[in-house]
Design a protein with these regions (language model features):
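HotDog/MaoC-like acyl-thioester-processing domains
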Residues: 1-15, 102, 109-156
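Non-catalytic linker/capping segments at the edges of enzyme domains
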Residues: 1-56
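A generic structural signal for short beta-strands and their flanking turns/coil linkers
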Residues: 16, 31, 40-42, 61, ...
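A conserved, well-ordered hydrophobic junction motif at loop->secondary-structure transitions
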Residues: 43-79
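Hydrophobic residues in beta-strands and at strand termini
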Residues: 46-48, 107, 153
Length: 156
């Protein structure tokens, strides 16, 4: 799905920091999740294939958690860029990379297979190198999981 409001955050990570299985553009075997800044929130989409099955017809929770993980670190990087007045459409790379210190996931409803999942992120707060982001993962109009991440901006 295309968004015209920003480049994907993960496509702006420097090459040497872009091998993450969940979101690295340089990991051809990975999920290559793409997080976009749209207004004051972040959006990503992912369509799981059937190898990620938990019970037949539903998606494995570990995948749900890893999507929230990578959307969370990407969202954190985007919100730091906003705070630092970095326009994501005017740069080739961003000088910001965040890693997960803590991730909380609440599974609210079974995540159905065969539906494009939508992830949304909202900034909760930034305090120095610590960024908290609240997230949802939805299928159609149902919130299947919520997440809260504490991401840490890695040192220069
Ligand atoms: C450098 C290579 C980068 C590669 C990028 C690829 C990332 C791909 C995305 C991921 O999937 S990340 C994978 C899962 N995460 C990890 O493997 C991270 C493992 N943990 C660490 O490497 C370090 O603990 C971490 C970088 C997160 C923090 O270490 P630092 O030495 O940079 O910072 P520090 O320990 O001083 O913590 C900074 C602040 O965060 C707080 N903090 C850290 N971990 C916390 C935690 N778990 N819960 C609550 N607070 C936490 C800590 O108390 C402190 O607060 P204050 O500044 O107020 O004192």
């Amino acid at each position: 799905m295309m968004h015209n409001k920003s480049k994907a955050i993960q496509d702006l990570y420097p090459d040497e920091l872009a091998h993450c299985y969940g979101c690295g553009k340089n990991n051809l075997d990975g999920y290559q999740l793409k997080t976009y800044l749209v207004g004051d929130e972040t959006i990503a989409h992912f369509l799981p294939d059937e190898k990620f099955t938990a019970l037949p017809g539903s998606v494995y929770g570990g995948l749900v958690a890893s999507l929230l993980d990578c959307h969370g670190t990407g969202s954190a990087a985007a919100f730091v860029c906003v705070q630092e007045n970095i326009n994501l459409n005017e740069v080739e790379t961003i000088p910001v990379r965040c890693v997960t210190a803590s991730l909380k996931v609440d599974f609210k409803a079974p995540t159905p297979m065969g539906v494009e999942l939508k992830l949304r992120g909202k900034l909760q707060s930034i305090e120095g190198r610590k960024i908290w982001v609240d997230m949802t993962l939805s299928a159609d109009d149902t919130i299947c999981a919520t997440g809260e991440i504490l991401a840490i901006k890695i040192k220069d």
